[in-house]
């Protein structure tokens, strides 16, 4: 059901119910839903049951009055074909064939804009995701964040929000110091396990690569950073630290580039300290009397803001706990004008939510409760050749995102330049194909298979099938399809496909409301299923010219919606498979 149709039906119900509630305090809300069973019609409404009890009337009798008024209203204008009363008082409506078919022309007229809206009206939204420590290659968990965060950003952008994609670099703290000593040890010729190897050092082969380039006095730079040239002095730990961080930021940039993810801004944790924002945040909380000292540490009264216990802000050794810069960072987000902030993070960050929100509330600068929003994802298990893969030689302790993209890409044809599109498509689609808060098993063998079991192949093949059919139609111009008579589209499979096309804008808005890009993947899988079922049941290029043209137009619209949905989640729409 298209938005314009939904609005018209809502207004018809409002007009029908007005006489029934006149003189009362009732102000019922018209809620329209799509029946789960298509045989029940196109639209379901429970309005009669909402008002029957307060009016002390039988809900079915109320429904009869509403239906009569609905169908008699001149504003109906061939929108509703029939209405039925079901169960205790549900009203099920069937749209006219012309109303169902109108989605095709809407899709063709709007093209890549179909499904988009101005719901956000330019409201500023910042979505932070990946935000990895620059201490190693991106892992599969970062990949899930990348897929979720980028798709979510595209969802908000499609609905008229002013979206900023931000990567927060945790470039301060113990882990960065560990990185520097790990590279220093490798530069001195030490190997993991050898005498003198630092405790808790990073063991991956990438540490040796950094050490080699440091000794060679090479220059590296991240996408938003100044070039950093290695000094080659193995005793200069600060030079090693700066070079190693820049090196790994560049490596992470390359991983994200292969994954098709681009950020609008990079924010360094170290800048919060260098610019005095962390100290200013702590001072503001002290002045507001939201802190106290105990056992040599500074505590924040987070229990005043729904946390289960107060939290240490500054330890007895003078260092800040990890949530303090987070509070400062989100204060900066608010001051930058982002009235909505969304963080996509691993589920291990669950414990930080209450304390960060408590710190923001304690500052009392107008930040609303529940700021920021969090989308937490669970772990990804990787299977390959029927076995779980836990360790990457490159990383030393985990499967990297680059590993997963390359494995899912398949073999390279000798003599051809390696194109990672197939692997990128598979990883991106797979990693948003489940709700973020569910654990996910990524089976590389499934990602490589050309079967219905592979969801990205299944959806892309639907698009390729349509391209093949349209390519066989050699006696016409696609632009002429805008004027085709669609009345011949009366087969049950055609009705199902038309209904699914009309659901696309609703699917996007549902995904936006739930902060759940998986809804887009679900929709695309369902649309592909309807297309495959239709393709197997009905011939498109039939002898009947009117029917052929109507079906070609339906195929063209379906291809457009598949393209729109795939583009939104960063997956290609190949013409051939």
UniProtKB/Swiss-Prot annotation:
Coiled coil: none annotated. It comes from the Bacteria. The keyword Transferase does not apply. Its EC number is 6.1.1.19. Signal peptide: none annotated. It is an enzyme of class 6 (ligase). Keywords: Aminoacyl-tRNA synthetase, ATP-binding, Cytoplasm, Ligase, Nucleotide-binding, Protein biosynthesis. It is found in: Cytoplasm. A motif ('HIGH' region) lies at residues 132-142. GO terms for cellular component: cytoplasm. CDD domains: Anticodon_Ia_Arg, ArgRS_core. The keyword ATP-binding applies. It catalyses: tRNA(Arg) + L-arginine + ATP = L-arginyl-tRNA(Arg) + AMP + diphosphate. GO terms for molecular function: arginine-tRNA ligase activity; ATP binding. One of its GO terms (biological process) is arginyl-tRNA aminoacylation. InterPro entries: aa-tRNA-synth_I_CS, Arg-tRNA-ligase, Arg-tRNA-synth_N, Arg-tRNA-synth_N_sf, ArgRS_core, DALR_anticod-bd, Rossmann-like_a/b/a_fold, tRNAsynth_Ia_anticodon-bd. Monomer. Belongs to the class-I aminoacyl-tRNA synthetase family. NCBIfam families: argS (TIGR00456). This is Arginine--tRNA ligase. The gene is argS.
